[in-house]
Design a protein with these regions (language model features):
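Amphipathic alpha-helical "coupling" segments that flank catalytic cores
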Residues: 1-349
Length: 349
């Protein structure tokens, strides 16, 4: 691994730092000091940290004091950022977002949060969520990007948004949604656990997809600088795992409408068509990575592919049928019927 002669070292820090959020403490230890937090039997953090040295020092106590001194400085920074952010308001952060660029042709982060807010409201009506709460979560979704804490620890974006939302009097539903908005962060990452978090995650990803496709920023080969494939996979997983049944093409069109009048590289209809093809390709790929048979995946996505949840249901049903002994004979019968209908259609034409 990382060390040839591992020597564990247990250090301490001032218990007063435990007033900081757990996530801040652990990130300070892990990112800056390559150390681990220490928990008690109940899972609460203790004022200690554990690191691993690469040698047996002559004076272990001196080395310990050095590590503690450096970590203390980092935690002091964290406490300063924490107190600074608690004095700020969401309104101040939202105003500051108007000066933060999302993607140059697509405007500011402030504009993005307004679009996300409107799209969350639209989605809420589709999946029986509170539209006002959904819109509020969308509007606050990127506010923590201009906080002092996220400026120092960018891996805490979203997480700090949720923590600050609770501190500043937002509802628990909104706070949880802010913390979950970047889920799933990878193929093995969980999807959001709440309804508001799910639609916020979808709205954010769809806004990025629609904007990038309108500008012609379509992934090719291994090049995917804006992680659009991951966006599509995340939407797919959320829709399947949460049981959302809305039409994705309709969702894309609504997101495009919210961009208003812009100078796009691709015509709006062309961009939506290309995005829809791209998205269905990612859905197919997801099914294949789950071990589904190629022929079955191709069969279910050949008809009405815009409802991802329905695709999953049809694929499951077809899988069950394919395991039955008479499936080959039934498939051949359907094929003959389809050929007859197709032939009659040509003759009638």
């Amino acid at each position: 691994g990382l060390v040839e002669c591992p020597v564990p070292l247990l250090g301490d820090f001032d218990p007063s730092f435990l007033e900081l959020p757990r996530e801040v403490l652990l990130t300070s230890m892990q990112e800056h000091q390559k150390s681990f937090g220490v928990e008690d039997a109940s899972g609460n953090l203790m004022p200690h940290f554990l690191t691993v040295l690469n040698l047996h020092p002559k004076d272990l106590s001196l080395v310990k004091k050095g590590w503690e001194r450096v970590l203390r400085a980092r935690l002091e920074d964290g406490r300063f950022f924490w107190k600074t952010d608690l004095e700020a308001t969401f309104d101040e952060w939202l105003e500051a977002l108007d000066a933060v660029t999302f993607l140059a042709p697509l405007g500011s982060m402030g504009e993005k949060t307004r679009r996300i807010s409107a799209l969350c409201r639209w989605l809420a009506a589709k999946v029986q969520q509170d539209p006002e709460q959904a819109a509020r979560a969308g509007r606050l979704s990127k506010a923590d990007l201009v906080s002092a804490m996220v400026g120092e620890f960018d891996t805490l974006q979203g997480i700090m948004g949720g923590i600050y939302a609770r501190k500043k009097g937002e509802t628990e539903a909104v706070a949880a949604a802010l913390a979950e908005q970047y889920l799933p962060s990878g193929p093995d990452s969980p999807v959001p656990g709440t309804g508001l978090g799910s639609i916020l995650s979808i709205a954010d990803k769809v806004d990025t997809l629609v904007g990038c496709f309108g500008l012609g920023m379509i992934p090719t080969g291994a090049a995917d600088p804006y992680a659009l494939r991951r966006c599509a996979l995340g939407i797919t997983r959320i829709m399947l795992e949460r049981g959302y049944r809305f039409d994705v093409k309709e969702l894309f069109e609504e997101a495009q409408r919210l961009y208003g009048d812009r100078k796009w590289k691709l015509a709006p209809a062309e961009a939506i068509a290309k995005l829809n093809d791209f998205f269905i390709a990612r859905v197919k790929n997801y099914f294949l990575t789950q071990g589904k048979e190629t022929l079955l995946v191709e069969a279910v996505t050949a008809v009405a592919p815009d409802n991802v949840w329905a695709l999953g249901r049809r694929l499951g049903a077809l899988e069950s049928m394919s395991r039955q002994d008479d499936f080959p004979q039934a498939a051949q019968t359907f094929k003959r019927v389809a050929n007859i209908i197709r032939k009659q259609g040509h003759e009638a034409g």
